[in-house]
Amino acid sequence: MQNITQSWFVQGMIKATTDAWLKGWDERNGGNLTLRLDDADIAPYHDNFHAQPRYIPLSQPMPLLANTPFIVTGSGKFFRNVQLDPAANLGVVKVDSDGAGYHILWGLTHEAVPTSELPAHFLSHCERIKATNGKDRVIMHCHATNLIALTYVLENDTAVFTRQLWEGSTECLVVFPDGVGILPWMVPGTDEIGQATAQEMQKHSLVLWPFHGVFGSGPTLDETFGLIDTAEKSAQVLVKVYSMGGMKQTISREELIALGQRFGVTPLASALAL
């Protein structure tokens, strides 16, 4: 019998959650991570599945995700503990045939349930499937320290925030030319914040929750982690720059345009226009 804990997707989740913890982005039970799988990914591990998978209804049907398996982090679980006990802190779930709920096939032992932000994740998965033709498979939420700090001092406007991050590090425009979406402050763990996040995910692979954290989307765990890491590095640079009295010089609009042309990306027009 093959052990599911040695699968690429469980090992990938262990690495991503451990790295995020070591970065300081996921204190206590902060943060959540979901990865969309295919049936072929989980097929070799049926012998590991629960004999009687628990069924949990979704707060709203998501037919686009019907019959789709995911691996998810659990509600109230600490990222730092995933590596110690994957089965207690992670779960493989599969949405039912009409998208009305899901079965917990593996993991989430002792009656644990998926992350409270599952509505935001699933709604965002729906939008990123449409926006990327199914390429994006990962949604990651974490409390990236410097990005959060900037939401207290920068105007919480997509164009303004995006332009500042692009100027904070040359690679940013190349990595997220579509910019950073920003919500107003909202109560987490609700359908409302999930719907607002998904709406921004139609246009942006990064979405900031002011005074709280960031959502990122990408095709792989590495790409999604790297996306957030790149934005957070720029935010760290900006925090240092602002604390030293602000910018004396920076990357110009013309230089940003040249950067986009060199790497074949189209920068967010509203940020470029500032």
UniProtKB/Swiss-Prot annotation:
It is found in: Cytoplasm. The active site is at residue 117. Its main location: cytoplasm. It catalyses: L-rhamnulose 1-phosphate = (S)-lactaldehyde + dihydroxyacetone phosphate. It comes from the Bacteria. Pfam families: Aldolase_II. Its EC number is 4.1.2.19. One of its GO terms (biological process) is rhamnose catabolic process. It is an enzyme of class 4 (lyase). GO terms for cellular component: cytosol. GO terms for molecular function: metal ion binding; rhamnulose-1-phosphate aldolase activity. Binds 1 zinc ion per subunit. Zn(2+) binds at residues 141, 143, 212. Its cofactor is Zn(2+). Pathway: Carbohydrate degradation; L-rhamnose degradation; glycerone phosphate from L-rhamnose: step 3/3. Keywords: Cytoplasm, Lyase, Metal-binding, Rhamnose metabolism, Zinc. SUPFAM superfamilies: AraD/HMP-PK domain-like. Gene3D superfamilies: Class II aldolase/adducin N-terminal domain (3.40.225.10). Belongs to the aldolase class II family. RhaD subfamily. NCBIfam families: PRK03634.1, rhamnu_1P_ald. Homotetramer. Catalyzes the reversible cleavage of L-rhamnulose-1-phosphate to dihydroxyacetone phosphate (DHAP) and L-lactaldehyde. This is Rhamnulose-1-phosphate aldolase. The lineage of its organism: Bacteria, Pseudomonadati, Pseudomonadota, Gammaproteobacteria, Enterobacterales.
